[in-house]
């Protein structure tokens, strides 16, 4: 009993320390977002008071300099549509793999698994050239590319869950007059809701925070996501408006933190459901 208590206490201490280490840079950015530029480098660890404190000035300047509101709009548009396309296409692909047992479906599943382990850096320059040749430097082209990169993990998760769905349920739906498409949308997809939620959260966080792929593909004169807007604060010769940078960073990370805190319990539920039933 004492060993269990000591082991539990040790784990609590370790995870508490790790949590503080993860929170430290976020708290530091938040504190410095209310300081004058000169004090961010001179006194980065001090609470902003008196002459240091500038209120919301850094936030306002950051929004004006980066076009952050427009970037938020494009990020929301790209993230929502990309996730919707990934959920629709990957769930249907997983259902096909589970229900049609052929060499083709086995190869298709193995390709999805292989796609999960191929580093993006190996193909990013070739991808950039192909996207430019096909005139995909717009949000619609980026959504198609996100589907390609998000398919591996999503198909893997959906397949693990759908293998557990009894075939008798689908047969009963077809006896009642449902077509295969109706069976999928009215029976299979609602049952797979935990996995849908988990995939939605994981893909949304990845797509919202992604900087490298859109910076290679998008026409930055017309379109930019939030991470790209933050990059616009870097001036010539490496000069940076640190005050505006801190304010913009806070605005950029707050939505995804709120989204994760609201949905984190669904991640655990979805992963557990897929692990137990798959």
At which residue positions do the language-model features occur?
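A structural signal for multi-pass alpha-helical bundles of membrane permease subunits
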Residues: 2-278
């Amino acid at each position: 009993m004492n060993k269990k208590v000591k082991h539990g206490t040790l784990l609590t201490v370790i995870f508490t320390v790790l949590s503080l280490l993860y929170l430290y840079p976020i708290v530091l950015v938040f504190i410095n977002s209310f300081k004058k530029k000169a004090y961010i480098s001179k006194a980065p660890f001090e609470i902003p008071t008196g002459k240091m404190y500038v209120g919301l000035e850094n936030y306002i300047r950051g929004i004006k300099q980066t076009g952050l509101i427009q970037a938020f709009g494009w990020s929301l548009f790209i993230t929502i549509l990309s996730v919707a396309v990934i959920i629709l296409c990957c769930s249907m692909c997983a259902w096909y793999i589970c229900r049609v047992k052929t060499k083709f479906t086995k190869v298709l599943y193995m390709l999805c698994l292989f796609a999960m382990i191929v580093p993006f850096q190996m193909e990013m320059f070739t991808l950039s050239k192909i996207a430019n040749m096909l005139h995909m430097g717009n949000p619609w082209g980026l959504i198609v590319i996100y589907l390609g990169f998000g398919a591996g993990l999503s198909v893997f998760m959906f397949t693990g869950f759908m293998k557990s769905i009894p075939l008798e349920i689908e047969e009963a739906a077809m006896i009642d007059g449902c077509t295969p498409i109706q069976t999928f949308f009215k029976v299979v997809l609602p049952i797979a809701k935990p996995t849908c939620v988990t995939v939605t959260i994981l893909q949304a966080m990845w797509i919202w925070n992604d900087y490298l792929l859109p910076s290679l593909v998008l026409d930055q004169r017309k379109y930019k996501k939030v991470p790209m807007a933050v990059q616009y604060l870097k001036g010539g010769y490496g000069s940076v408006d640190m005050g505006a940078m801190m304010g913009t960073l806070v605005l950029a990370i707050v939505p995804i933190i709120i989204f994760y805190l609201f949905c984190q319990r669904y991640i655990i539920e979805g992963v557990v459901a897929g692990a137990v039933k798959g």
